[in-house]
Regions:
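Beta-rich interaction/scaffold domains
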Residues: 127-303
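Residue-level detector of short, conserved catalytic/binding motifs and their immediate flanks
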Residues: 52-54, 63, 107, 161, ...
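Extended recognition patches within non-cytosolic domains
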Residues: 105-131
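Residues on the solvent-exposed faces and adjacent turns
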Residues: 5, 58, 113, 165, ...
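Short sequence motifs at beta-strands and strand-loop junctions characteristic
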Residues: 45-48, 103, 143, 230
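Flexible glycan-contacting loops in extracellular carbohydrate-active proteins
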Residues: 75-105
């Protein structure tokens, strides 16, 4: 038989072929990567629970194992696969022995009619990793962009990403967004991501629409996003910048209790009850402003 185990009892990749006939204990004839008798092969690498590519190339006189893009090694054999006979059974996730079933997932199984070279194994691995990275690459909803975009420079498995833009005056290759002026039309541009891994590349395009300023809407959104605690017993941190780059200033209705900066000046004595204060935020953006009041209670002293 030929047997592939992503992780044996020692957590190592195992890929072996029986090199002779021993009906009572065929496992003692295993040759290859992590065989039962270590003298008949080489130790496989420790593997993990992440997705990985396991490749075995069997020729008339050798078995070679690969883990992702790394060649583990080659072990000479004398038994040919054709000697296994006909009417053979093949299992995925099940052993020929009375072992427990495989607990994991299998994404894809490929069988070739020829022996792959190391170059081919690496090429397949890199292209598969890049395809998965491309499929998973997202920059969010691009139908009505109002803010700078986060464009990743690196992805999992060592994939690097570079970006190009069709119109840098609207969105730069770093994701900096310049919105059209209020009353103008939206701008639609293309961002192109080039994903690279060890000399292999794929590209993915994103169509991005940048909408013009609408100061009333934008300030309303910025104000809606602004939130404060309703009851406080210690100083609060007041943001000075809001959504879309709006600036925020603050004004307290009673600075003898709570300052404009959010610092508690005095708390009521225990038993006097909480002191109510209104803290008003003024959000400003491109010459327009909107106010948002917050009713806050400064807690009385505990004792």
């Amino acid at each position: 038989y030929w047997l592939l185990n992503p992780a044996n009892l020692s957590g190592q990749m195992k890929s072996v072929i029986t090199n002779s006939v021993n009906e009572s204990a065929p496992y003692n004839t295993e040759y290859g990567i992590s065989p039962t008798n270590s003298a008949y092969g080489i130790a496989g690498p420790k593997t993990g629970s992440d997705w990985a590519k396991y490749t075995t190339v069997i020729t008339e006189n050798s078995i070679t194992g690969y883990y992702n893009d790394q060649k583990i090694g080659t072990v000479e054999i004398t038994n040919k696969v054709e000697n296994f006979g006909t009417d053979l059974f093949a299992y995925i996730g099940k052993s020929s022995y009375s072992d427990m079933f495989y607990k994991g997932s299998v994404k894809e199984v490929k069988i070739y009619d020829g022996a792959q070279s190391y170059k081919q194994v690496k090429s397949d691995y890199y292209n598969e990793v890049l395809k998965a990275a491309k499929d998973g690459l997202s920059i969010g909803d691009t139908s009505a962009v109002k803010e700078d975009l986060t464009l990743p420079a690196t992805l999992e498995n060592g994939v690097s990403v570079s970006w190009e833009t069709s119109k840098a005056s609207v969105i730069t290759a770093e994701g900096k967004v310049t919105r059209p002026e209020e009353g103008k039309t939206s701008e639609t541009i293309t961002l192109t991501a080039t994903l690279s891994l060890n000399g292999y590349t794929v590209t993915k395009e994103f169509e991005v629409t940048v909408v013009p300023w609408n100061l009333d809407e934008d300030l309303a959104e910025a104000a809606a996003q602004l939130k404060l605690a309703k009851v406080i017993s210690e100083d609060i941190e007041l943001p000075e910048e809001g959504k879309y780059g709006s600036t925020i200033t603050w004004k307290s209705s009673d600075d003898s209790v709570l300052s404009d900066a959010g610092a508690i000046v005095s708390r009521p004595e225990s038993g006097k009850g909480n002191q109510k204060v209104t803290l008003t935020a003024t959000l400003s953006l491109n010459g327009k402003s909107v106010e948002k009041p917050f009713k806050i209670e400064v807690m009385e002293e505990f004792y």
